Amino acid sequence: MKLVEVKHPLVKHKLGVMREAEIDTKKFRELATEIGSLLTYEATSDLETEKVTINSWNGPVEIDRIKGKKVTVVPILRAGLGMMDGVLEHVPSARISVVGIYRNEETLKPVPYFQKLASDLEERLAIVVDPMLATGGSMIATLDLLKAKGCKHIKVLVLVAAPEGIKALEAAHPDIELYCASIDSHLNEQGYIIPGLGDAGDKIFGTK
């Protein structure tokens, strides 16, 4: 599995602000979008381009254009919605495929409850977004679902990843790419990432 921890100063600064205990919902939401955008920039750096000729203000000119790669953004509900707009800033024509999976707080196991996927997944690059990669259970279940529907090319974007989740994801899906803003220390007994961000979904949606 390709693992990239994006260490750009802007990413580190924005993530540091997100860790503040008293951050408000508006700021947390804005920063999730901004880091999602920066991770997308990194994750799409290998997209192939081709030369095409267009009519410019000064006549025909040859330009670079992304070569026929269709994209679907896959936010894992609900927290993944907080990163979705950051991806769409760069690929505004992407289809949106939604997967609903929540983590049982007692067993820490993923529980699927909703899916609405693009019809031609086998032809698309899937960019899966979720702020936290903790145990990896929800992400693994999502990727299992995408692959069962024919998706062959998957990149995962998360804000914060725990070593335990990275290990589990690599064991289950060694062929995918994972981009994160930080690899944090560990999971606590409740399955939360330390130091982490707290409950990212609650902070994005202003709920408790």
Curated annotation (Swiss-Prot):
| Control of this protein's activity | Allosterically activated by GTP.
- State the NCBIfam families in the record: PRK00129.1, upp
Q: What is this protein called?
A: Uracil phosphoribosyltransferase
**EC number(s) from the headed UniProt entry:** 2.4.2.9
What the record notes about the co-factor is:
Binds 1 Mg(2+) ion per subunit. The magnesium is bound as Mg-PRPP.
- Point out the gene that encodes the protein: upp
Job of this protein: Catalyzes the conversion of uracil and 5-phospho-alpha-D-ribose 1-diphosphate (PRPP) to UMP and diphosphate.
- Which species? Haemophilus influenzae (strain 86-028NP)
| Keyword vocabulary terms for this entry | Allosteric enzyme, Glycosyltransferase, GTP-binding, Magnesium, Nucleotide-binding, Transferase
> Which domain of life does this protein belong to?
Bacteria
Kindly state which reaction or reactions the protein catalyses.
UMP + diphosphate = 5-phospho-alpha-D-ribose 1-diphosphate + uracil
State any GO BP term from the record: uracil salvage
